Structures are given as C-alpha cells and as structure tokens.
C-alpha cells in the first residue's frame, strides 16, 4: 500500500502487531492489535541470511543516515529528538569532537530471518483498545527483518589541516583490511610496520547489537572483535534483533483509527538537516578551540569560549525542541510546513545564524593562533604560566626571586559584546531585542599585522632572555593574560623585589664582560650549584649539603667506586651542566683552581690529560698563595693581576652562546674583571674545581 511505512528499527523493540504513532515516531508497547492466537496462526518466518561490510568515510549526518538506511523524514525526527535510539543505532549520536580529526567507520551487517503477519486487512478480528479509540496510534507492525549491525568507529588524534586528507586516506586503506586480516595462533594481529604505526594512533568505539565480553578500544581489538561477530549472532539467528520494520496504516484494520495526513516535503527535510548539521559543526569548532592547551592556561579566553558553549548548547536544544514539537503537528495536518520553515528562517535572521557564529569563531581561532605563535616560543623553557593577577602576585611576592619579568597578553578581553547579544536573544523573545549586533572583527587587535608582528618580536626577545637566565636563582619569568588598554597585543612587566617597576620593560643592553662594575648587574644571572659526589676525588671532603669542599691529604674519604670519579687529581665537578648565561660565586682559601670543564674530560689518566687547565676540555683560574693568580688552558699559563691580592670571593660569568667565561674579584657590591677566556663551546660546561693540588691545603665554598 502507498501509505505503508518502511523504516529501520534503530534499536527499538518492535514486535509483530505492535502499534506505532508515525506522527511522533513513538512505539506503543504492551499491546498487540491481533492477539496471540491470531498472530500464531498468521505469522510466517523465512530465512534471509546475509552479511556484508561497508566503509563509511564521512561523519556527516547524511552519511550516517545512509549507513543506517534512514529515510529523510525519520532522519529529521531523530535530529529533532523524537526518536530515542538503542543498540547499534547509538552510532548516530557519536560525532567527532574536532574538525581536524580523521574518522573512518567500518559497518558490519548481518540478516537472519524475515517474519510477517500474512492476513490481509479485513480478514481477521482485531482487538479494541483505548489507544485506537483516542487516536494515539497511526500504524501497526506487520513485518520485521531480523539481524544485527555493528559499527567500529576509528578516530585519529587531532591533526593539522595539511595532514588531514593524507591521514584520512591511510585510515580508509587500513580499515578496509579488517575483514581480511588473519589472526595467528598467538592471537596477535599481523600488520605491516606502517599499519602498526597508524593503528597505534587510532582510538576505536564500538556500537553494535552484539553482546561482547569487552568493548574494543584499539585497532587490534577491533580486528579481533570483527572475527567473532558471525558466531555471536547465534545459531539460526537466536541473538538477532529487529533491523527493519514494515508498518501498515492502522485505519486499514480499524476505521476509527487516526492516520498520517502528510509527510514533510523532501526539500524542507534537507533544509532542517542542513540547519542542524551547521549547529553541530559550529559546536565542534568551539570544542576544538576549548581543547587547545594554551586556552586551558588563560582563563580570560577559556571562560569566554566556555560561556559561548553553554549559551550555544542551550540554543541548540531549543531548536531541536521546537522541531520536535512541530513535526507531529505538521504530519497530523494541524499545522503547515511553514511552521518548520519559520524555525529555519528565525535562526538565519538571528545572532545565532551560521554566518555570524562562524565569524565570531573565526575571530576566536585567529586570537588563539596569535597567542600560540607567541607562547610557543617559550614552550619548554623555565617561563611559568600563571592564570591571573592573583597568582602572579603570589609568585612575585612570595617567591624567592628578586627580579620578575612577565610577558603579558594585554588585549584578551573578559567581556565580549557578541556573547551578551547571544545570551539576551536566547533568554528573551526576539521581538524584545531592539537590535541585532554582529560580531566585529575589523578593528580586533589579532587581525592587525602590525600588532601581531610587534607581539612576536617582543615574545622572541623575552624568549631569548629566558634562555639566557636559565637556572638563575634571582630572576623569574612568567606569562599570563591581563587586560590593559594602554598596550595593544602584549607588553612586558618588570617587578623588582615584589613591586611593579614598569609595565613596558625593555631588557637593558649588556656591556662587554670587562664593563661589569656592579655585582648586582651580574646577580641577575646567579645560579645554584652543588658538588657532584660521583666525580669528587677521594682526598676531598664535603659538608654543608655538598656546598663546602676541603682537601684532606691525611684522611682518605670512603666514596663508592664510580666511573665518573677523578682518580689522579684533587678535582670535582658540579652537578649542573650549564648553557646560556650564568653567574656564580665561591669563597676560596689556599691552593685552588676554579673554572669550567666538559663532562667528557678524562678521569683516570695519571698524566696531565685529566688535570684542569692542561687540556682542551677545561678553562681555569688558579690561585697559589706564593706566586699569585694564573689563567690556564691547554697547558698554556699566563699571570693575572688582581687589584687586591688575597681576595676571598671570586665571581664567574658564563656566556655560553657568546663563547666566554669571565672571572671577577668580588668586593661588597663591586666586581673587578680579572680575565676572560674566549672560545666556541660545543657542549654544556660544568663548574670545575681543583682543591689543594700537589699535597697543598685548600678549601672552597659555593655561594
């Protein structure tokens, strides 16, 4: 009959004789129109065994509906929230979280038996019920095809736009192999190296009408599960479920019954599909923006996106609810299709239109991209992200650093006028909104090439100095977002001993190493050091948390054997390998060599190959109370003049990138340059000390 309906079961518990309201897509369980005796007499069953698999490469609603054999009208009912699906049909609710994510789905379908009620209308007596008398049903189930569906949904990690198509193609090729992959006796999946590499980055989600002992979550799990599906359906389809149903108009069996007056125009259905698909796509874009690591670190932008998500989700639910309310009325002939068109038109003319929301998300994504281009420069350095002014104050005031340098994103706004418009529109009837404000991007800071370039230049300068001050105990570097209308894009704040000194800090130009006169200028680069117990010679003792060393020629220390230990000379390295710019001070007394060395310096040679200053691995300033100060490298020695012979505090300044290590006599807040070695360093250097060489006494304290 032309008014018969054919539809997928979608995990709903259809039985022969069950009543159905096609206006509301609602099953009416607990009652059979024909009764058990009549059903028994006129029911026929025919085996209809088949199986197939199919690849679904798209995540669109249209592709999913096609995979589930859903016609346009039922599809709109599902999107509008009228149909509650179960079993394998829950696949319809599984959408990608991100736009930049590849998804490929393997569908397995098996059919087992076809059952039908064979008595024509008018030849059997039907049971009366208040359901039919009150017009609560329009159709009755007359045939059911049983079987089972299974969907293996494989998702890649979030990828860059440029890699999306390539990953998608490789995923399709790999997923197509699942039905043909063999599992050896060890139950391991045999894959090529390339397939293993791809599979390791895929996640799997299973939606099916099969009862599994455990759900597959990986590609390998999916392969193993797929192999078992034919047996899980049971002998003679014992475990199969309704897959497809045929429904006859109830009026054919009961003249008092209501009927479906009209189905919705296909073009109208497509417009509703498009509208709801657009909403889901916009939602995914917001999800993707929210998941950016940098967004999680910056509450100003995180809260803005979160606020949008809440408003937009409420709006989506409102649209779905309106569609769900109108569909039954249109199908019953109570309202015209124009009521559905009005939902589409209202959205197109509202602040929630696809054009306006897309424009706002474009601006958010641009803003995030600019922030990432700056923040990415300091990723992996010691610069610390703080979430707000309170946390920054805590770090600056309570922290141990004397100098705090802060890269501030100044133009990330807390209040967004467009979000206020969205909120007002959703909460109030459209007629009460005086005007519709579209999101503005023309004058937004992140679209200004000049502003962005200045931000990136400032970020690069900040990054360079973060690297220069690596391991400095007196300087801290921080990143955050604080609104400040005085500066577009970004600025650098400087705090000195807990107080804000300037909101527009410029790093001072460094003098030549000979030009340093004030100790405070070098203390910016001060770092903490400790002696390395694995390198210390057995004739040196350690104390004060490994910061004080003394020669012990009359008492051998019982250090454990270690390949890094110096054997032939009274020497020790520090634990810290240094690159960048660093300053440290020592108090020395007696016979001492102070400098730097590569970790690769020999340890056990009895000649001078392992002695500091006698090879290409080390650079030292030596103090001998009898003859004074000597700089030594590669066995070459030169006397060094000191302004006050016998001074007790020595400062060392390393500029690794510039290739220099400088020595200073320290007195109060003044330093006097003694000597600078110039070279090209090829690996990290370690503070190095020789304490009491050749049987002499010496002590040294790290400050």
From Swiss-Prot:
Keyword Secreted (UniProt): yes
Residue ranges of the region described as Structural FAT domain: 266-385
Posttranslational mods: Intrachain disulfide bonds may be present in the heterodimer. Not glycosylated.
A GO molecular-function annotation: toxin activity
Tissues expressed in: Expressed by the venom gland.
GO CC annotations, alphabetized: extracellular region
Keywords (A to Z) from UniProt: Cytolysis, Disulfide bond, Hemolysis, Hemostasis impairing toxin, Ion channel impairing toxin, Myotoxin, Neurotoxin, Platelet aggregation activating toxin, Potassium channel impairing toxin, Secreted, Toxin
Region called Structural MACPF/CDC pore-forming domain, residue ranges: 2-265
UniProt cross-references to InterPro entries, sorted A to Z: B30.2/SPRY, B30.2/SPRY_sf, Butyrophylin_SPRY, ConA-like_dom_sf, Cytolytic_pore-forming_toxin, PRY, SNTX_MACPF/CDC-like_dom, SPRY_dom
Alphabetized Pfam families for the sequence: MACPF_SNTX (PF24674), PRY (PF13765), SPRY (PF00622), Stonustoxin_helical (PF21109), Thioredoxin_11 (PF18078)
PROSITE patterns: B302_SPRY
Segments forming domain B30.2/SPRY: 508-703
Biological function: This lethal (towards mammals) heterodimer induces hemolytic activities due to its ability to form pores in the cell membrane. The pore may be composed of 10 SNTX-alpha/beta heterodimers. The toxin elicits potent hypotension which is endothelium-dependent and appears to be mediated by the nitric oxide pathway and activation of potassium channels. In addition, it displays edema-inducing activities, increases vascular permeability. It also shows myotoxic activities and interferes irreversibly with neuromuscular function.
Record-stated family: Belongs to the SNTX/VTX toxin family.
Assembly description: Heterodimer of alpha and beta subunits; non-covalently linked.
Record protein name field: Stonustoxin subunit alpha
